[in-house]
Amino acid sequence: MRVRPTGVIPPMTTPFRRDGEIDLKLVAPQVDWLIGAGSHGMAAGGSTGEGHTLDHGEYRDLMAATVEAAKGRVPVIAGIIVDSTRDAIRRGKLVRDMNIAALQVTPVHYLFKPDEQAMVDHFRRMADETSMPIIIYNVVPWSYLSPALLTRIMNEVPLVVGVKQSAGDLKLFADLMMMAPDKLIYSAVDALMYPSYTLGAHGSIAAILSAAPHASVALWDAVKAGDHAHALELHKKLLALWNAIVSDNLPACTRYAQSLQGLPKTLSRAPMPEASPAQQAVIGKALEGLGALTGKRVEAAE
């Protein structure tokens, strides 16, 4: 593997304009802001970034802009959310010559799902044809992979190097940590980052990190330093923010939280609605509790 990404890895929001196009010049300000907060890596094109709405050209351009903005300061992970092995491979090939540390790949996520052998074959073909490290993004409710199946895939396909575990059940997370001790296990259980870290998570890739990167890095650092009193305090404040942003329009609520902390205002891609006035009020209050409202604006380079 080119690099083993660990620590706090925020999944970026994609900066859409009102006409639905990506405003690529606003990628760099977000990358710089997240790195400035102490983030250890960057993920683009995932669910927080509405990667499922991007066509192949947009996907390639977004990844290129993210890699260019990162300038090698932190590893970049490329999300892939598509419905077929063919399209997943195509996206992987679009970015394999960029400075991408790994692919973050969801299982196919339409109403029906492949059986276990077909799922193993899906990730095997991706690995064989892209030659890139793969992190399974275990998030799709109707195509959810058990710890046993995840472990089987990682054992049979060496380029599958880890899992981003996104269920709220810490028992599943703990089982996976125990069954795959030599693999990279990331938490995407936004409400439970603190216990995930104490269980030994290698890092996190979750929307809460993009909504409050400074506090999220502080939580990681506190657990690593053994300062559990401070970690618990941060956990409670971050949980209040998570409760404010978690909703069907989570990407919009995440980008609204970012805008309150200085990033340029951007939009979700239609038909996803923006944060409602009620959501905005609760998000603002939670960020105030974190001391995250600085009023400093982040400007895009011309």
PLM region spans:
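C-terminal alpha-helical cap/extension of soluble enzyme domains
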Residues: 4, 9-13, 37-39, 198-201, ...
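Catalytic alpha/beta core domains of metabolic enzymes, predominantly
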Residues: 125-128, 140-246
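Active-site beta->alpha loop and helix N-cap motifs at the rims of alpha/beta catalytic domains
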Residues: 2-10, 14-142, 152-154, 297
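A general structural signal for well-ordered alpha-helical segments in protein cores
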Residues: 9, 27, 59, 63, ...
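Short secondary-structure transition/capping segments
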Residues: 54-57, 90, 115-118, 147-149, ...
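Short helix-capping segments at alpha-helix termini
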Residues: 68-74, 98-99, 129-132, 155-159, ...
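Short glycine-rich loop/turn motifs that provide flexible caps or phosphate-binding loops at active sites
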Residues: 6, 19, 40, 44-48, ...
